[in-house]
C-alpha cells in the first residue's frame, strides 16, 4: 500500500478541498493508499519518513514554507506540485509587485477594516516572509505538476489513479482555443475592439476574443474542457497556466493580441491605443503565473528568494 502525504504552503487550501470533493471516489483511492500526513485533514505536525507520493499545495512565501518544502522533498520518492499556486505561484504571486514592507503596511495598518491603533506589525513567532513568492520547482525538484486553482476532483482522481497503477499521468498539452467549440471567423480570429467583462452582452456561441473580451484561452492549457467559456459564458482567466510549449503565459497572450488585433482593416484603432484599453495589464495576463514569468517581480525588486 502506497503512503501519501500532503501539505499546504503559500495558498488557500482550496486544492485540498477539491481533493475532499472526490466524495465516495476518495474512498476507492484510500483503499489503495495510506494517508500518513495531511495537516489540513489530520492533527499532525511532524513530517514522516518514507513517503511514496507527496502533494505540496502552494508556492513559497515564507522561510517556513521553504523549510517544509525541502523536508517533504527529502522524505518523498515522488513530489507533485499540487495546483496552480504550487506550479506557478498563483494569485498570491501578485504580491511580487510590491515589497514586503508595502504588503505588511497595507495588511496591518491601512486597510479600511483594520483596527490597529498602535500600528504594530506582528513579528514575534511569525515566520519571516521571503522577498517574493516563488513556484515550488524553483526551490526543490518536482516530479509532476498538477495545475488549476483548484484542480477539478475528476482530474485529481485520474492522476492519483495513474500513479498508483505506475503509469504516467496524462494531461492535455493543447490550449483552450484548440478545443473550444465557440464559433470563430473563417478568416481567423480578428479582434476589432477590447471590452471589460461587464461591457456589452456576450454572444453564447461566438469566440469571446472575437467579441473583444480578453480571453486567455490561446495561452492556457486545456484541462478543464473550457468550463468558464462554455458553462459560465465568461472569458478564460488562465488559471491552468500555459502548455508545455509556452515559456511565459502573459507574453504568449500579448503576442496573440498583437497578431489578432484589427489594426490593418481600415485602421479601426491605432495599435498604440491597445495598451490603454487593458486597465490591469499584469492582473489580466499574469493573474496566476507572475512568479514563473520571465520577469517575476518589478525590476526594482529583483532580489534573491531569501
Swiss-Prot record:
It comes from the Archaea. It comes from Methanococcus voltae. InterPro entries: Hydrogenase_assoc-protein, NADH_UbQ_OxRdtase-like_20kDa, NiFe_Hase_small_N_sf. The keyword Oxidoreductase applies. This is F420-non-reducing hydrogenase vhc subunit G. The F420-non-reducing hydrogenase vhc is composed of three subunits; VhcA, VhcD and VhcG. One of its GO terms (molecular function) is iron-sulfur cluster binding. SUPFAM superfamilies: HydA/Nqo6-like. Its EC number is 1.12.99.-. Induction: By selenium deprivation. Keywords: Oxidoreductase. It holds the Pfam family Oxidored_q6. Belongs to the [NiFe]/[NiFeSe] hydrogenase small subunit family.
